[in-house]
Amino acid sequence: VYKRQSFTVPEGIVKISVTQHLGSGEARPGNLDLGIFDERGAGFEGPGFRGWSGGARRSFEIGETEATPGYLAGRINPGRWTVIQMSTTAGRTTDWTLKITLTEGPRAKKNSPRRRTRLRN
């Protein structure tokens, strides 16, 4: 069973943090999987896919220059982003809360192009 939680990212955001809190109905670790898609769409084979950790993590972060393993760092563009949660325990209900934190800050500076220098003997 897939559940999608869309949220709006305004201009000026440099990091997204997502934490999943599970209630007392949890059967075993890893029965709730997490992933995220950016403003380009929430299709698994589409350009908006930014990461998936399955049930290996209960939280992740995506920033412009760093991200939790399993997720892609890069510019945090404004628009509608989507966290997807999948239950791998059929017929079982679990209380859960999703906390999404958006961090504002200055954009990462782009690296200036490097000039090639030839060494001569």
Model-found features: residue ranges?
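Low-complexity, Pro/Ser/Thr- and charge-rich linker/hinge segments at domain boundaries
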Residues: 102-120
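Short, small-residue-biased leader/transition segments that mark boundaries at the very start
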Residues: 1-2
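Surface-exposed beta-strand/loop patches in noncatalytic accessory domains
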Residues: 21-68, 78, 88-95, 100, ...
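Hydrophobic beta-strand segments within beta-rich accessory/binding domains
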Residues: 5-26, 72, 81-86
